[in-house]
């Protein structure tokens, strides 16, 4: 498939994923302070310009997830670098989404991963070496390496714990944007159901 055809297919997949996410009111409960992005990389992507994402990220408007902009190439930094690094360990990973992490959500996601035969992982940011944290661009390779060493492969779902000035976050990795959003919205609906029961 030509690169142009791939690019159009990816933008279409991302637009569909975004539409699905914006229709899931429950996902607003998983919105982190840093907001959410969904990314989808071209095969063999080596730079952020080869990764499509939601321009301006996704926030909450009137109780629903809402994109600040449209899917665009080069619209993400952090999540784009994460996907590019993750692909060094698994070529099947093309897309990702981030969302809020706390102890209650961790329990739900662990069970969801177990029930769906997904590999669950976590990163202990307190173990990150000072020289790695201080050097631009060094954290991402270290984080992905930690995940692979701990899980013996790249996890499907993982969280980053607290770090200095860092918000804990979950990340789902998958073959395309639609599939990672499907998992995220399923988790959001389970989370909402549990919160309603305990209210």
Model-found features: residue ranges?
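Conserved mixed alpha/beta catalytic, RNA-binding, or beta-rich assembly cores of soluble enzyme
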Residues: 1-199
